[in-house]
Amino acid sequence: EFYHQNGTPISAHNEEQKKQTSPYNLAYFVLNAPRDILYERIDKRVDQMLEEGLVKEVEGLKREGCHRGMVSMQGLGYKEILAYLEGEYPLEEAVRILKRDTRHFAKRQLTWFRRESDVIWVDKDKFHWDEKEILEYMLSVLKEHDILG
């Protein structure tokens, strides 16, 4: 569709856009952690979502008429729990798949960030996971780049 409207492929347009500098003065931070810790935290987060009522939430959405074919039901958590509710597999399997798919999503995000230019990686381990230290570092970078006065 883009090609038909503009006469150039979308890939050429995207390449041209990458070459342009942003009109904004910004810093692009990515908080990073060792993969084993990241995956452990993902597993705990999924467990927390379940404890806080993910299954009941999806049951309610299903009662309201939401179904598998809807884009809104394709999000992480919804599609796995919906498959469980529809008898596709037991809850334990739905949870296993949700954790696996969330880990895969996190891996894809990190891959995407690595391709970005001007990313400032913040390895949380180097700051002993101390949020105050991380914030102080980020503020110092912002001051260095004249983003903060």
Sequence positions of predicted segments:
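Phosphate/pyrophosphate-binding catalytic cores of soluble transferases and nucleic-acid-acting enzymes
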Residues: 1-149
